Amino acid sequence: MLGPMIEIDKNGSELSPLELWIENILKGQKQFAVLVDPDKCTKEMVPKLMKYLPQQATHIFVGGSTVAPGKTHQLICAIKQHGALPVWIFPGDAEQISSEADALLFLSLISGNNPKYLIGQQTRAAAQLRTMDLHTISTAYLLIDGGAQSAVARVTGTQPLPAEDLEMILNRTMAAYHMGVKAIYLEA
């Protein structure tokens, strides 16, 4: 089993959260994820969040750069209690993993060379994932210079790629593709 958000395709096969997401895109259905930071949204705020969530939202991403242990899990449980949208974890580190989510964006910060965020956090997460029934989506994370230092750059000590260096951005993206990454996340 690949997790709770499994659907069946026309041939009777199970679709993972990633396959369902891609199938919806190929059908021309727009996908819109709302990112909720557990440091800025408490479980008590979730009913109001769900009330004012844009109707176009198809997913909820939960995660942040610096989140205290347990907060992500609490927020995911509250969101699932008050809504029906798939919840995917967008983790800042391995402490933000929860078995209650529908999927985990298994991030590797490939725009920099900090081994802690290239493979270190992923190694820590792998130990937890062995005991969970949580679908993972390998995701390359690229920080692109947007003119101001982001929380991710500050926390990870990673410099963003220059926005005008399209060759470097393309090369990093293609390297991720050749390593089998299923999704690319660009942040500026």
Task: Describe each model-derived feature in a short phrase.
Residues 2-36, 126-138, 145:
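N-terminal amphipathic alpha-helix/helix-capping segment at the start of soluble metabolic enzymes
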